[in-house]
A protein has these predicted regions:
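Two-component histidine phosphotransfer core
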Residues: 1-165
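Hydrophobic core positions in the C-terminal catalytic ATP-binding module
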Residues: 63, 104, 176-184
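Short, proline-centered helix/strand-breaking motifs
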Residues: 79, 85, 180-186
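A short beta-strand-to-loop micro-motif at the C-terminal edge of the catalytic HATPase_c
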Residues: 165-177
Length: 186
C-alpha cells in the first residue's frame, strides 16, 4: 500500500497510512502480553485495522461497525486481537476476490447484561470458493492461523470457565458469504 502511494506520488496518503499502521502495531505490542483487554480497546483496534484494509482495498468493499446503544463496552473484557483474524479472513479470502464491491458488517449487540454477541458478516465469495482459489502453501498458512485462534479460545475457556464461544457459518445457500458469531460473557 505504501509503495503504491509513493509510486503514485501521494505522500500525504503514504504518511497517513504509515502513521495509522504504526499506531496499530504499537497497540498490538502493548496488548500482546495480556490475557484480556477492555472491549472498548479491542473495538478501537478493530476500527483502525478495518480502516487500513479499506484504505488498501476501497474498490473491493464497504464496511460498517455498529455498537448496540445498550452495550457498555467498558464492562466487558476480551482476549486482545481475537476478532482481527476473522475480519482479516473476511477481507482477504472473501471480499478481495469478489468482482463487484462487497460489504463487511461488524456488530456488537448486548444479549443480556452478562453477554455480548459479536457478529462479523461479509458477502464475499465464501469459504468453499476461497479454498479452491488457494495454493497449497496458502491453505497451510490459513489453517494455522484459524487453528491458533481455536487453541487460544480453548485455553482461555479452560482457564476462565467458557467465556468465549465462536461459530462460523455460510450465510447464503450458494455458500457465498460468511458469518462469524462470537459470544462473549463477563
Amino acid at each position: 500500500s505504501v509503495n503504491s502511494f509513493i509510486s503514485n506520488q501521494d505522500e500525504r496518503a503514504a504518511n497517513r497510512y504509515l502513521s495509522e499502521f504504526s499506531q496499530l502495531m504499537r497497540s498490538v505490542l502493548e496488548n500482546s502480553e495480556k490475557d484480556f483487554i477492555p472491549l472498548e480497546k479491542e473495538i478501537e483496534l478493530l476500527e483502525l485495522y478495518v480502516k487500513l484494509e479499506h484504505f488498501r482495498f476501497k474498490d473491493k468493499f464497504e464496511y460498517s461497525i455498529t455498537i448496540d446503544d445498550h452495550l457498555n463496552v467498558n464492562e466487558f473484557v476480551i482476549p486482545p486481537m481475537l476478532l482481527q483474524p476473522y475480519v482479516e479472513n473476511a477481507v482477504w479470502h472473501g471480499l478481495r476476490y469478489k468482482k463487484e464491491k462487497g460489504k463487511l458488517e461488524i456488530n456488537f449487540q448486548e444479549i443480556d447484561p452478562e453477554t455480548v454477541l459479536i457478529t462479523i458478516t461479509d458477502n464475499g465469495i465464501g469459504r468453499k470458493k476461497s479454498q479452491e482459489l488457494k495454493t497449497e502453501n496458502q491453505k497451510k498458512q490459513n489453517s494455522k492461523g484459524m487453528g491458533n485462534i481455536q487453541k487460544r479460545i480453548a485455553i482461555l475457556n479452560q482457564m476462565y470457565k467458557d467465556k468465549v464461544d465462536v461459530q462460523v457459518n455460510n450465510i447464503f445457500e450458494n455458500e457465498e458469504g460468511t458469518q462469524v458469531q462470537l459470544i462473549l460473557k463477563k
